[in-house]
Amino acid sequence: MQRSPPGYGAQDDPPARRDCAWAPGHGAAADTRGLAAGPAALAAPAAPASPPSPQRSPPRSPEPGRYGLSPAGRGERQAADESRIRRPMNAFMVWAKDERKRLAQQNPDLHNAVLSKMLGKAWKELNAAEKRPFVEEAERLRVQHLRDHPNYKYRPRRKKQARKARRLEPGLLLPGLAPPQPPPEPFPAASGSARAFRELPPLGAEFDGLGLPTPERSPLDGLEPGEAAFFPPPAAPEDCALRPFRAPYAPTELSRDPGGCYGAPLAEALRTAPPAAPLAGLYYGTLGTPGPYPGPLSPPPEAPPLESAEPLGPAADLWADVDLTEFDQYLNCSRTRPDAPGLPYHVALAKLGPRAMSCPEESSLISALSDASSAVYYSACISG
């Protein structure tokens, strides 16, 4: 890195001003003169001889006749207004010229507008004979005006813009606009949720950023597109239809008939059930057809645990928690309704197949259907 010389970058002495008498301009002689002058010269230095600054003249007024600000221009304008060619008077103006003066002298306190109304009313009351001299005078003035001003053309004055451009008041609206009205209330005044519902804003852009509540997961979400949904079959009035899954019931009602079809025969049939895979299509083909029943969808019933049957994949671990009495409320091995009043849960097995079946065949079919439905239902729930 190179170093600059000591004198480089130092501030030079300011140049001597030529307009000052005390500035050194002639070498050392000027310095010696200043020192020889003594303290008196230092005490009273000479005043700097600055050039005389030009004096500011007062602002001149604009040229006369320019921008229309001169009095002469205003006078000329007034003279032009007064000297402009006026229209010739009609008969009413000729008559009202003298009549107005007479009414003004008789009624000095009346306004000019009131006098004009009085003159107009009085002119209409005159008959044609009384108006004739004024009509002739107006015709003479028109002919004289035409002679004096042959190139005259009537140019009506423009109306003031203030009358056309009326300012809108804060409460004044345009003709095509209507004041905003609150939406009608379809419900009467109520407390709680009803009032909150009525106070909600209308559906529109306010709901774009809001999300609707997510519904609970349905058992049908796990079904494949090709699989059929489960719908309960229509039931006759004398038969009890399938109840919703885990419907509320009294546990004591299921134990009133221990010797009926809810007991050992159904459990024995479930223990000796054949493989369930071939009968899965039969279960969904027979019971999976949608009917006119408008009620909610119900998942397939659960199956009790099997003792000697082969486990059906990961669903076999869940069968140990299934209660046998909970599954018995959905199936009934008898075709007729029992006489016991405490058994309201029955299903007519005559509607499960196209032909009549005996009791052993019904038991085996019931067990096969229960195994197939349980396997498909649990596999769909686990995979979903």
From Swiss-Prot:
Chain intervals with Basic residues compositional bias = 152-166
Q: Mind telling me which SMART domains this protein's record contains? A: HMG (SM00398)
Q: Among its keywords, does the record have DNA-binding?
A: yes
Q: Which domain of life is it from?
A: Eukaryota
Which ranges are annotated Low complexity under compositional bias? Answer: 34-47
Oligomeric form and interacting partners: Interacts (via C-terminus) with MEF2C (via MADS box).
The protein depicted here goes by the name Transcription factor SOX-18
| Species this chain originates from | Homo sapiens
